[in-house]
Amino acid sequence: MNVIEVKNLSKKYKELTAVDNISFNVKEGEILGLLGPNGSGKSTTINAILSLIKSEGSVKLFGKIMSPENYEVKSKIGVIFQEVAVFEELTVLENIDYFCGLYIDDKKERTKYVMDALELVHLEEFKNFYPKQLSGGLLRRLNIACGIAHKPKLIFLDEPTVAVDPQSRNNILESVKNLAKNGAAILYTTHYMEEAEMLCDKIIILDKGKIIAEGTSDELKSLTNIEEKITIESENIENKTIEKIKKLKNVEEVTYLNGTLLITYTKGKNNLVDLIEFLKANKIRYDKIFSERPTLNDVFLELTGKELRDWCLPIILNTL
């Protein structure tokens, strides 16, 4: 079942088109990653889906047209924005209980939900702490617990791991995976390519408000012309040798700096084998050699013009 159905969604700010006629679906238990440079339209897309801003096109959530007054649909949604939104005067436990109570009236049921949320983000030992006593990573985990305590079937996560410690980051990613395993549909925005690669079932790359690529991580990697990067550590590679390497089959680019030779290949087979044979034939000694396949970051940089553009777009961070 499609939990999110977006068709021909657009949003304009005077002369600027922030979201340009995009369409996509998200199913139950699926994690969709939205990637793009700053100002590419990620946050605007979320705000439009949630009816926090007016837009053109069609948005259906759980098969129903989304609108600001559709409280039945809103009760099934959890939203975790990048900015932490909790009450400083309440403890961790009280904060989660408050936000859960906006949806769950029954006290016994709510208590169970709150404890489940605490366990999900591993904050049990901090339940009586106040927000000011928590690290940045723990605060973000609290923020997530508050957003998902009522067990929503659709969850929006906007850059949830920005500026957190590695332990909290791993915990957050584990929590997101568990939420999807339990059937929640998740729309996840991030700047971290490795997160999207590890976490998301499908990925959409946005640039200038348009979808420029979508698919699984492997499908997106197949779009890049870069097939392989080989790095060689050697202090005795002459310019004439570098010129010969540039003429080898499938070689796209060669750079040599401070004893490190980096060779970028286009698609092709046996690149590493051919290179080693060349080095042996030319009696070139080297200390280390290793190969690296293209990453999602390579795809992202290639498709978006290899620069992260900052636009001045208004970002509306209202809560539901």
What are these language model-derived features?
Residues 37-41:
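Walker A (P-loop) phosphate-binding loop of ABC-type ATPase nucleotide-binding domains
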Residues 57-68, 73:
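Conserved ABC transporter NBD signature motif
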Residues 89, 130-137:
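Conserved ABC ATPase signature
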Residues 97, 101, 108-126:
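Conserved ABC ATPase "signature" region
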Residues 155-159:
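Catalytic Walker B motif of ABC-type/P-loop ATPase nucleotide-binding domains
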Residues 173-266:
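ABC transporter nucleotide-binding domain
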